[in-house]
Amino acid sequence: MSDENKSTPIVKASDITDKLKEDILTISKDALDKYQLERDIAGTVKKQLDVKYGNTWHVIVGKNFGSYVTHEKGHFVYFYIGPLAFLVFKTA
């Protein structure tokens, strides 16, 4: 695991319960430890959330992106781990 991956997540925006947020941060950190490619990290997080919390999760991981999304109430978090931004949300 690189030093960048050891960074504490920094939440920039959220509409989510603390329990769900902590679970998403843990799943994301684990995926970051396991994979190098952003699409693999995003895919792993999405699949785990779909299994654990039901379908229609969306996960975007990268260093430079814009977004404008609609999400299910209580199911949105935007955070950084090291240099990577994570946008995670669920739609109905």
UniProtKB/Swiss-Prot annotation:
The gene is DYN2. Gene3D superfamilies: Protein Inhibitor Of Neuronal Nitric Oxide Synthase. It comes from the Eukaryota. Homodimer. Cytoplasmic dynein consists of two catalytic heavy chains (HCs) and a number of non-catalytic subunits which present intermediate chains (ICs), light intermediate chains (LICs) and light chains (LCs). Component of the nuclear pore complex (NPC). NPC constitutes the exclusive means of nucleocytoplasmic transport. NPCs allow the passive diffusion of ions and small molecules and the active, nuclear transport receptor-mediated bidirectional transport of macromolecules such as proteins, RNAs, ribonucleoparticles (RNPs), and ribosomal subunits across the nuclear envelope. It is found in: Cytoplasm, Cytoskeleton; Nucleus, Nuclear pore complex. Its main location: cytoplasm. It holds the Pfam family Dynein_light. Present with 1310 molecules/cell in log phase SD medium. One of its GO terms (molecular function) is dynein intermediate chain binding. InterPro entries: DLC_sf (IPR037177), Dynein_light_1/2_CS (IPR019763), Dynein_light_chain_typ-1/2 (IPR001372). SUPFAM superfamilies: DLC. This is Dynein light chain 1, cytoplasmic. Belongs to the dynein light chain family. GO terms for biological process: establishment of mitotic spindle localization; establishment of mitotic spindle orientation; mRNA transport; nuclear migration along microtubule; nuclear pore complex assembly; nucleocytoplasmic transport; protein transport.
